[in-house]
């Protein structure tokens, strides 16, 4: 399944979740798009709820189905809770860490920065958004890319960095100090439904 590239606000309203992380999509119209949007949301079956939760998480991180399932299967081989491990693996993607550090305003912007070679991991350029960042690794910006408006503007407005990351705004450099705990990740997601979906 290809990555969704349509209007993110419309998709956010359909899923009932802010994919941009700002919440603006749902402020004025907290209902699904279309002529029947303002009415009650259709009651979903058990399968429908599981599918919707999977779609929420997949679109939140902006990954295609193949990448999503690959990480899900990888999480199954780890010790601990399957669903929590899956969430942690998604959060450790390089594009997501770039976003969480405040170097981009959205995950989509962060993915573009990585794709275009603007991001360094431990001083070396990495242009693979799905790269798994490990605890202790440092994420930075190439010298030639430090004046990009997309980066400067994002850093200026960002006022929150998760506790499992550190960030130096002057150096445009951050460290993935540890793996996040489940309580630090997407409280609006019920990952147990996603595990149930793939266990059918």
Curated annotation (Swiss-Prot):
GO terms for cellular component: small ribosomal subunit. One of its GO terms (biological process) is translation. Keywords: Ribonucleoprotein, Ribosomal protein, RNA-binding, rRNA-binding. Residues 92-155 form the S4 RNA-binding domain. InterPro entries: Ribosomal_uS4, Ribosomal_uS4_bac-type, Ribosomal_uS4_CS, Ribosomal_uS4_N, S4_RNA-bd, S4_RNA-bd_sf. Coiled coil: none annotated. Transmembrane segments: none annotated. It comes from the Bacteria. Pfam families: Ribosomal_S4, S4. CDD domains: S4 (cd00165). GO terms for molecular function: rRNA binding; structural constituent of ribosome. One of the primary rRNA binding proteins, it binds directly to 16S rRNA where it nucleates assembly of the body of the 30S subunit. HAMAP family: Ribosomal_uS4_B. This is Small ribosomal subunit protein uS4. It comes from Bacillus velezensis (strain DSM 23117 / BGSC 10A6 / LMG 26770 / FZB42).
């Amino acid at each position: 399944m290809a990555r969704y590239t349509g209007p993110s606000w419309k998709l956010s309203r359909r899923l009932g979740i802010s994919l941009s992380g700002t919440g603006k999509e749902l402020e004025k119209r907290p209902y699904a798009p279309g002529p029947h949007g303002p009415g009650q949301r259709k009651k979903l079956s058990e399968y429908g709820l599981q599918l919707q939760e999977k779609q929420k998480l997949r679109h939140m991180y902006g990954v295609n189905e193949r990448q999503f399932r690959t990480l899900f299967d990888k999480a199954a081989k780890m010790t601990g809770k399957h669903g929590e491990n899956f969430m942690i693996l998604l959060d450790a993607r390089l594009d997501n860490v770039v976003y969480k550090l405040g170097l981009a305003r959205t995950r989509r912007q962060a993915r573009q920065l990585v794709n275009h070679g603007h991001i360094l991991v431990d001083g070396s350029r990495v242009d693979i958004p799905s790269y798994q960042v490990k605890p202790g690794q440092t994420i930075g910006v190439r010298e030639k890319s430090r004046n990009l408006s997309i980066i400067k503007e994002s850093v200026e407005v960002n006022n929150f960095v998760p506790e499992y990351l550190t960030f130096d705004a002057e150096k445009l450099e951050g460290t993935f100090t540890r793996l996040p705990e489940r309580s630090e990740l997407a409280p609006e997601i019920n990952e147990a439904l996603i595990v149930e979906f793939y266990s059918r």
